[in-house]
């Protein structure tokens, strides 16, 4: 059975910080946050590189978006708005679902992989904790053999006699910079 590839085409507008922890793990609840993720969820704690990271929304209600993401008009192509349904079998998800997948990865679910599809210069500026980086050009510009290695080593695909077997493939969640960004869609289409 072919697994559905999921795409979160907008970078989470959340902040994160390393929380201190001792014998007990952070509960994901911080008393009195005014800007919550949902009415019931103030923060989401995940493991990233051996540390607990608390993801929460920026508490400054006067905060403005980072200028790197503030342009409302970009030349198309290449910065064209992506369709809501990228391809058959591909589901576009929102930020809450992205957080659920990050929690699954954090709790040790090896069947889910959250991928930052952006190029290295974007990742260096910041990424979502708990993700791995597979830049969009890695799949679109590589040889068939290299792509097969990625499918096997990262995505859980197995090689049969002459076909690839997707029976145990992981659920992939890909993201990039937003609606105008084609990096995750390029990875998905590859």
Language-model features, listed with the residues they occupy:
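Flexible, polar/low-complexity N-terminal or interdomain linker segments that lie immediately upstream
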Residues: 21-125
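Mid-length scaffold segments of soluble, non-membrane domains
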Residues: 104-155, 162-168
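Bacterial N-terminal signal peptides that target proteins for export
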Residues: 1-6
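Catalytic cysteine-centered active loop of the rhodanese-like fold, especially the PTP/DSP P-loop
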Residues: 155-190
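Cleavable N-terminal signal peptides
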Residues: 8-10, 19-20
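N-terminal signal peptide c-region/cleavage motif recognized by signal peptidases
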Residues: 15-17
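Phosphate/oxyanion-binding active-site loops and adjacent basic polyanion-contact surfaces
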Residues: 90-94, 139-140, 144, 183
């Amino acid at each position: 059975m072919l697994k559905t590839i999921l795409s979160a085409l907008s970078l989470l507008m959340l902040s994160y910080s390393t929380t201190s922890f001792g014998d007990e793990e952070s509960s994901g609840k911080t008393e009195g946050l005014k800007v919550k993720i949902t009415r019931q969820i103030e923060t989401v704690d995940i493991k990233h590189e051996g540390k607990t990271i608390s993801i929460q929304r920026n508490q400054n209600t006067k905060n403005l978006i980072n200028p790197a993401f503030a342009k409302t008009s970009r030349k198309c192509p290449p910065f064209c708005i992506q369709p809501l349904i990228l391809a058959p079998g591909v589901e576009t998800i929102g930020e809450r679902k992205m957080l659920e997948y990050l929690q699954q990865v954090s709790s040790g679910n090896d069947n889910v992989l959250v991928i930052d599809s952006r190029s290295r210069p974007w990742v260096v500026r910041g990424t979502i904790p708990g993700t791995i980086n597979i830049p969009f050009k890695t799949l679109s510009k590589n040889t068939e053999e290299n792509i097969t290695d990625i499918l096997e080593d990262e995505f859980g695909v197995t090689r049969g006699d002459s076909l690839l077997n997707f029976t145990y493939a992981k659920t992939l969640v890909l993201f990039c910079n937003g609606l105008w960004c084609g990096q995750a869609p390029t990875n998905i289409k590859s």
